[in-house]
């Protein structure tokens, strides 16, 4: 007789870390990845385990509106809302990417009430590495 395979819940059913096993997180790391087309905000604990995340796409913005500063602000607010409920007091902010949502996401994080220990820019900059692609002619 065939074994029944337990159903694995999808991400839409609930956030990771939600439910009965909510742990207190006094200090965390907020990663903001801002590209020209989207902004992804991930909140981890100090060891790097993901507690909550959100992006402009999951916040309801589609198409070109995902790259706007308002979409980045909404994504940052959605990602931080769950960790504030879990008791996060202090956080480090690591920002990566050249997108428009960098400043808007940082402004939303500052308004959330979490004390920021430092803000670091980790945007990758080539030291004359690979040749960039040719310029577009429109």
UniProtKB/Swiss-Prot annotation:
Q: Which PROSITE patterns match?
A: RIBOSOMAL_S11
Looking up InterPro entries in the UniProt record yields:
Ribosomal_uS11, Ribosomal_uS11_bac-type, Ribosomal_uS11_CS, Ribosomal_uS11_sf
- Compartments (UniProt record): Plastid
**Short name of any one Pfam family annotated for the protein:** Ribosomal_S11
Region feature Disordered, mapped onto this chain: 1-22
GO molecular function term, any single one: rRNA binding
Alphabetical UniProt keywords: Plastid, Ribonucleoprotein, Ribosomal protein, RNA-binding, rRNA-binding
Q: What domain of life does the native source organism fall in?
A: Eukaryota
**Which GO terms of the cellular component aspect does the record hold?**
plastid; ribonucleoprotein complex; ribosome
Name the HAMAP family for this protein: Ribosomal_uS11
Tell me how this protein assembles: Part of the 30S ribosomal subunit.
Descriptive protein name: Small ribosomal subunit protein uS11c
Organism field: Cuscuta reflexa (Southern Asian dodder)
Q: What taxonomic classification does the UniProt entry list for its organism?
A: Eukaryota, Viridiplantae, Streptophyta, Embryophyta, Tracheophyta
Gene this protein is translated from = rps11
């Amino acid at each position: 007789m065939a074994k029944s395979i337990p159903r694995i819940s999808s991400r839409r059913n609930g956030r990771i870390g939600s439910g009965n096993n909510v742990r207190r997180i006094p200090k965390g790391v907020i990663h903001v990845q801002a590209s020209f087309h989207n902004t992804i905000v991930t909140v981890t604990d100090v060891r790097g385990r993901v507690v909550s995340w959100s992006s402009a796409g999951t916040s309801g913005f589609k198409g070109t509106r995902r790259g706007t500063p308002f979409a980045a602000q909404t994504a940052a607010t959605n990602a931080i809302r769950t960790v504030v409920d879990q008791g996060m007091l202090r956080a480090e902010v690591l920002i990566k990417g050249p997108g428009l949502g960098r400043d808007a996401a940082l402004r939303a994080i500052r308004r959330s009430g979490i004390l920021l220990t430092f803000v670091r820019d980790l945007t990758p900059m080539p030291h004359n590495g690979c040749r960039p692609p040719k310029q577009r002619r429109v």
